[in-house]
């Protein structure tokens, strides 16, 4: 199965900004699905180093860990 996750949330809502990546790398990817992530609108700022390192939502891993796992597993991230 192939799934493309999308978020438009940025730093103003760190939990919502992290959910798509969390579902992609800790959900679908772990059960063997092909996944990709689209960052649009305010979410594009999440790839900046200082932003990436500071975003921590509630109940999800920090954004830097999610992006590292995505990179480790070659998950495409579209901006």
Task: Please name every model-derived segment.
Residues 9-11, 41-45:
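Acidic, glycine-rich active-site loops and adjacent beta-strand->loop/helix elements
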Residues 17-30, 37:
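Histidine-anchored nucleotide/phosphate-binding helix
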Residues 31-32, 74:
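Glycine-centered short loops/turns at secondary-structure junctions
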Residues 34-40, 77-79:
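Short internal beta-strands
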Residues 53-79:
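A glycine-rich helix N-cap at a beta->alpha junction
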């Amino acid at each position: 199965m192939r799934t493309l996750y999308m978020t438009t949330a940025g730093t103003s809502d760190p939990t919502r900004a992290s959910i798509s990546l969390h579902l992609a790398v800790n959900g679908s990817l772990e059960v063997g699905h092909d996944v990709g992530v689209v960052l649009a609108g305010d979410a594009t700022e999440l790839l900046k180093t200082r932003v990436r390192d500071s975003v921590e939502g509630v109940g999800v891993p920090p954004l830097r860990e999610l992006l590292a796992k995505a990179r480790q597993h070659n998950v495409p991230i579209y901006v």
